[in-house]
Each structure stands twice: as C-alpha cells, then as structure tokens.
Amino acid sequence: LEISLKLDRIDSVNGNLVVIDYKSGEVTASHWDGVRPKDPQLPLYVLASEPQANGCAFAQVKAGKIKFTGVSASDLIPEVKPLETWTAQVAQWEHAIGALAEEFTSGIAQVEVFDSGSFQFQNYLLPLNRWHEESDINTELLDKSTQ
C-alpha cells in the first residue's frame, strides 16, 4: 500500500527525531493503542520517518490549553513521560497498522464505531457505508457459496 504523508513538524532533540502534529481540539495518545488504533496518524509518521523517530506528540494549541500529549523513548518532549518500552510500542504500531493496511488492500473496509456519540453522524453516510446491509450481503454470499 503506497500513501503520501505530510507531517506538521519534525524536531531534532539531542540527536533524536520527534514527530509533532498540531491540533486545536482535544487529543489523547490512548487513541494510538490496540489492534485497531482509533487515530493511527502519529504512529504511522513514526514508522515512516527515516531515520526512525524516537518520539511523537500532539501539540495542542487550544486557547487556554496549550500542551504536548505523546510518547517517546527518553525525556525528549516537555510534559511527556518517556516509555521504557519504546521499541515494543513501535513494533506494536507496526503490527497494527500493517494489519489495517492489509485489510484495506484486501477490500475490507468495515465501519468501525468507537463511541456511540460519533454514531449520530452516520446518518449522512448511510448510502456509502452500507453497514445496515451487512447481514443481507453475508446471507447472499453464503447462499452462493453453497450452490
């Protein structure tokens, strides 16, 4: 899978690269966790950087709430506690993002609803995502495979 990326900023801190992405809204690094990350943007930037970055963070630039939220291999980013398991974290991101890319290139593009609050916006996308037709499609495919 070939994609183009546009990073906001890469800093060199004591010879280590740190990927920074500016955000004006609420941000959380926990959205990078798990087998299906909710927001894989910064982990993808880390994996794509050459040489590989040793940290990544959102730089929240919201009035009255300016802060860094992220992770790093060592004490590279103000207000961000370093991870003792940076190498393992990068390996987990590589596995998770690789699995997502493999699904996408295989034609798997299911709708993933992470929280019920975001589901209210799905009404506008119903003609595109077809999640409500999933049961009928699976039944039809099963019928065709048994014939």
Question: How would you name each of these model-derived features?
Answer:
Residues 1-147:
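RecB-family 4Fe-4S metal-dependent nuclease core
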